[in-house]
């Protein structure tokens, strides 16, 4: 009879916490296994199967390996691990001849790592965050405390923006990751936030490749969009109907318009630069204009729910990557708004981990 872990009851609290502590070092393996699975197209291979239930050998026969038989034995262990982490389901059946057949299929969790009907997934975002350039910075996290240094800057002698400008491969990884995750986020945002209704012109400051504006204009085609970002960023931006790509520096000035978007911009900067950016936005707005800030709002107290865990984890990411970068509380956003001249802010909607906050000029 097979041994099932589901039948084991652990009621001793001390044992539970000790076992959780013992498991902590294994957290690294999940990211690395997922990275390998994405690079090998494992999830996509299963998704494209007519049965969507494949054995390790059936999967191995579709990847560029010299020996599918040998590779399937290693792959089986990878697949079992992913099943234990809820990224796959494992199906074990016994044939009439007594042979055991094991197959795997996708779960809602792994569905997020395969391309949706728009070609977007979270896979490029996971690859970016497990890239050696990013991971190596984490080894210097203690220096943020001991020496007050930004780990990424210490590792590479420049900030993350300068690095992506210099390294075309990393710039491509970053753009692809942001393109995919932005597409997913913005589909949700335009569903739950109606603040773009009746708007004639929208400026997306730091808009990258223009994905956010494209999502907005697909629902509100009468909007004229200006996608504003650094010249080396917009040079790779695709052409969209109704969108003009404009190069510039948000720390100096931004184009004028009735509504300005700042999506995941402020968390990259310290308070002083945030106020500069917001003041430039304030000057570019008409009296009845507003800035739509799309950011994560950090809770005042470190709770242990899914939202809180993610928000505090992203705050660590900002600390590693950017000088003064951080996730902010609602009060901290209010303080920035007042310093920049805005009269008030209002939290309008939430999409996944992101909140839509309106900053009013008057």
UniProtKB/Swiss-Prot annotation:
Its taxonomic path starts at: Eukaryota, Viridiplantae, Streptophyta, Embryophyta, Tracheophyta
Gene Ontology biological-process entries: biosynthetic process; flavonoid biosynthetic process; methylation
Q: Which domain of life is it from?
A: Eukaryota
Q: Which family does it belong to?
A: Belongs to the class I-like SAM-binding methyltransferase superfamily. Cation-independent O-methyltransferase family.
Nucleus as a keyword of this entry, yes or no, is no
What is the name listed in the Swiss-Prot or TrEMBL entry for this protein? Myricetin 3'-O-methyltransferase 4
* Active site per database record: 267 (proton acceptor)
Q: In which tissues is it expressed?
A: Mainly expressed in stem and petiole trichomes.
UniProt-listed Enzyme Commission number(s): 2.1.1.267
| Pathway assigned in UniProt | Flavonoid metabolism
Which catalytic reaction applies to this protein? myricetin + S-adenosyl-L-methionine = laricitrin + S-adenosyl-L-homocysteine + H(+)
Q: What does this protein do?
A: Flavonoid 3'-O-methyltransferase involved in the biosynthesis of polymethoxylated flavonoids natural products such as myricetin derivatives, aroma compounds possessing antioxidant properties and exhibiting pharmacological activities such as anti-carcinogen, anti-viral, anti-thrombotic, anti-diabetic, anti-atherosclerotic, and anti-inflammatory effects. Catalyzes S-adenosylmethionine-dependent regioselective 3'-O-methylation of flavonoids; active on various hydroxylated flavonoid substrates, including myricetin, thus producing 3'-methyl myricetin (laricitrin).
Which residues of the sequence carry a binding annotation for S-adenosyl-L-methionine? 229
Q: Which CDD domains match?
A: AdoMet_MTases (cd02440)
Q: Enumerate the GO terms in the molecular function aspect.
A: myricetin 3'-O-methyltransferase activity; O-methyltransferase activity; protein dimerization activity; S-adenosylmethionine-dependent methyltransferase activity
* Gene ablation phenotype (knockout): Accumulation of 3-monomethyl myricetin but reduced levels of dimethylated and trimethylated myricetin.
Q: Which InterPro entries match?
A: COMT-like, O_MeTrfase_dom, Plant_O-MeTrfase_dimerisation, SAM-dependent_MTases_sf, WH-like_DNA-bd_sf, WH_DNA-bd_sf
